[in-house]
A protein has these predicted regions:
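Non-catalytic terminal/interface segments that mediate subunit docking, oligomerization
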Residues: 1-13, 17-19, 30-33, 39-40, ...
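Long, structured ligand/cofactor-binding scaffold of large enzymes
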Residues: 1-87
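Short, well-ordered loop/turn elements at secondary-structure boundaries
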Residues: 4-6, 40-42, 82-83, 102-105, ...
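Short, electropositive, low-hydrophobicity segments enriched in small/polar residues
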Residues: 10, 25, 57, 96, ...
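Catalytic cores of large soluble enzymes that bind and process phosphate-bearing ligands
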Residues: 23-26, 64, 148, 165-179, ...
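Conserved catalytic cores of soluble enzyme domains
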Residues: 49-192
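Short acidic (Asp/Glu) and glycine-rich catalytic loops that position anionic groups and cofactors
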Residues: 156-164, 202-211, 263-264
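Terminal amphipathic helices with adjacent charged low-complexity linkers/tails
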Residues: 168-225
């Protein structure tokens, strides 16, 4: 989570210095959790992308299971259907899995040297009259692509000038960042005053006493009500069903004049 021009967003960034930003086992779950946060909070998802796709010797870890492989890209479609934008700044080379990252967001902003292309045996096979790829077909594909080196299919020239995938292209890397900020600025945001139910105030009890109540010694129990009284506006707390489930404390309180729900474990009960 981060703020872009004072608006919250979920940010996913490739670290191209580690395995060229490749996918490894468990990454799809991490990406899916990030999209879940964007959905729950109704805030944009922003990628800074320079991804070399799936690490080939870990394919079985990436594609096996339900929340893997293409799940993050399906989640992009879900967010867009809900009106939650997915923005991507594209840098460097993004083949295969990196290509899906590139094409599935709502708005694509690219550095002039960026490129994106999906790949895999199935895609290459689909380009061949035969339903599979053999040595003859592979050599034919290699020969055919030699003529594309001056204007490769995944280049900015193609995806900005021909397919129209890329919305904007910048000669400087900083220009991509500035464009992302520009589009985030265009998005609506909540005004907290709409949800404020009271004038903000400090707790009536001394907040600094929390350091004496909650100690590093985890074997020493403490009274959770003493903690609650030093966290919320005016030290006010409206407890819900106090006689049920004594190991838990639930209720309503205010933080900075905003109404919040409270769930706390009671120390020393179980």
């Amino acid at each position: 989570l981060g703020k872009i021009n004072d608006k919250w967003a979920v940010v996913i960034a490739s670290d191209n210095k580690k395995l060229a930003g490749a996918w490894v086992g468990g990454q799809a779950l991490k990406l899916t959790r990030a999209t879940d946060i964007a959905k729950m909070l109704n805030i944009p998802l922003v990628y800074l992308l320079n991804c070399s796709g799936v690490k080939l010797d870990e394919q079985e870890k990436v594609y096996a299971g339900r929340v893997t492989g293409g799940t993050p890209f399906y989640r992009h479609a879900e967010l867009e259907q809900l009106g939650i934008p997915v923005l991507v700044g594209i840098y460097g080379t993004n083949p295969a899995g990196g290509g899906y990252h590139s094409i599935s967001p709502t708005i694509l902003i690219a550095h002039e040297k960026a490129n994106m292309a999906v790949g895999g045996a199935g895609i290459v096979g689909g380009m061949n009259p035969k339903p599979y790829v053999d040595m003859e077909a592979a050599l034919a594909q290699i020969e055919a692509t030699k003529g594309l080196r001056s204007d490769p299919p995944g280049s900015v020239a193609i995806h900005y000038g021909v397919t129209g995938f890329m919305r904007e292209v910048y000669t400087e890397q900083e220009g991509v960042i500035a464009a992302i900020k520009k589009y985030v600025d265009m998005l609506p945001t909540y005004d907290l005053e709409f949800f404020r139910v009271d004038t903000p105030q400090s707790p009536a009890l001394n907040e600094m006493e929390l350091y004496d109540i909650v100690l590093n010694n985890k074997n020493r129990p403490y009274d959770m009500y003493n903690v609650i009284g030093r966290l919320f506006d005016g030290s006010q707390f409206m407890e819900y069903k106090k006689g049920y489930g004594p190991e838990m404390i639930t209720g309503l309180a205010k933080v900075d004049g905003l109404l919040v729900g409270v769930v706390a474990n009671r120390q020393g009960v179980l």
